[in-house]
Amino acid sequence: MLEEKPVPKEWLASFERLMQVIDTLRSPGGCPWDQKQTVESLAPHLVEECHEMVDAVARGDMAETCEELGDLMMGILMVARVASEGRGFHPGDVATGITEKLIRRHPHVYGDVEVDGDESTVLKNWEAIKKEEKAAKGLDESALSGVPPSLPALLRAYRVGQKASNAGFDWPDLEGPEAKVDEE
């Protein structure tokens, strides 16, 4: 197992300051708009901020990427803060959950699984672990599960195509799928 490096103190201080600002905005005497927000009302803003960040990355504008990542981070932490007000989890739970998931899904780093530097083996292991997690939660394990209905149409079609390909529905020409449709 690799030795983990400490997180720079200035990073931790920045996160703490951001959480203080979010708490102030939500508190009595804070911002009326922020106080009225709900998990549901904030969700569309996260989608928009994510698209803005992706656009900045695509343009190669790192200063804008940093700013948009900040907007996205604020949105995520705001949703988690709002959820802490009686919705069952808080920002610490979010961080703990993703930390545990990353460790669990990287047994080649945090366990004794060997991948010999092979990225495809890493991805296969990731998908197998993800499938086990879903089964343990009693979630849908169908070949096309895990594609959010809220994705934009083109991205959703692409993801469904990827999942179908992984399930063996991948042909080099149109004759293959036509034969499969006729078979069904």
Regions found by a protein language model. Give the residues of each.
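Flexible "arm" and connector segments at domain edges
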Residues: 1-68, 74-184
